[in-house]
Amino acid sequence: MSDSHHKPVWDRTHHAKMATGIGDPQCFKGMAGKSKFNVGDRVRIKDLPDLFYTRTMTYTRGATGTIVRLVYESPAAEDEAFGNEENVEWFYSIVFAQKDLWPEYSDTFANDTLETEIPERYLEKA
């Protein structure tokens, strides 16, 4: 069997080569354009379909939270897993009240929050 039968469909080391000496996600800095949302904005998490992997947890979908930080620019995991690095987007750090995610959450801990990073495609104005 010749070596040509063992070559990957795409260069799986492309991303590592691109990030060498710069870092990831820093290698995507400036590629997402202007952010759609800002710190302090209230956003609702869309319930978009996903194939096998997403950074957007199911329990956040449909919930409303507050953006506390624009974290970085990067392709979403759903795209990057298939070698699609053209769709660079903003990732936001969003804070949710635990009670908004789990209504049965004890009132004893009413001030508890959860903070997570979510890509822009999953966000809409609340």
Curated annotation (Swiss-Prot):
GO MF terms, alphabetically ordered: thiocyanate hydrolase activity
Signal peptide range: none
Record has Hydrolase as a keyword: yes
Its EC number(s): 3.5.5.8
Tree of life domain: Bacteria
Alphabetical keyword list: Hydrolase
GO biological process: thiocyanate catabolic process
Pathway in which the depicted protein is active: Organosulfur degradation; thiocyanate degradation
A matching Pfam family: NHase_beta_C
InterPro entries xrefs: CN_hydtase_beta_dom_C (IPR024690), Elect_transpt_acc-like_dom_sf (IPR008990)
Catalytically driven reaction(s): thiocyanate + H2O + 2 H(+) = carbonyl sulfide + NH4(+)
Enzyme type, top EC level: hydrolase
Disulfide partners: none
Entry keyword annotation includes Hydrolase: yes
Function as written in the Swiss-Prot or TrEMBL entry: Involved in the degradation of thiocyanate.
Assembly description: Heterododecamer consisting of 4 alpha, 4 beta, and 4 gamma subunits.
Name of the protein described by the UniProt record: Thiocyanate hydrolase subunit alpha
